[in-house]
């Protein structure tokens, strides 16, 4: 699980579009990520790299609303055209089954608790 305190809009944009930085469309999409995250609070960011594929999930709050976006690709292509934040809710996020990705499910649940002001400190 990534620690979001170290995640910036720039680092997310680089994860998604660094391999296309010399391509005009890649530059445009890189800038789209930066614009959509301007003034946002990143709540969850997962970026996974496997042998021949990558996937990413981003949950953020902007102007009091929750947004999420998800992308995946194989080694042949990148995340082109997949950065598409959609408005969501805690109810939607918590009811969803994240098949095969427990880290995202745990990160969403933890972000919900923190966002709700629940004390997540564990004591014996």
Where are these regions (language model features)?
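Acidic, low-complexity, intrinsically disordered interaction modules
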Residues: 49-56, 61-85
């Amino acid at each position: 699980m990534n620690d979001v305190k170290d995640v910036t809009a720039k680092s997310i944009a680089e994860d998604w579009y660094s391999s296309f930085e010399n391509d005009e469309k890649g530059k445009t999409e890189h800038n789209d990520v930066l614009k959509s995250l301007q003034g946002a609070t990143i709540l969850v960011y997962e970026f996974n790299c496997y042998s021949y594929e990558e996937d990413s999930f981003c949950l953020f709050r902007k102007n009091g609303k929750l947004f999420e976006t998800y992308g995946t690709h194989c080694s042949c292509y990148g995340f082109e055209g997949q950065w598409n934040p959609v408005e969501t809710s805690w109810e939607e996020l918590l009811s969803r089954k994240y098949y095969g990705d427990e880290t995202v499910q745990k990160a969403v649940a933890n972000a919900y608790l923190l966002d709700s002001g629940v004390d997540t400190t564990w004591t014996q």
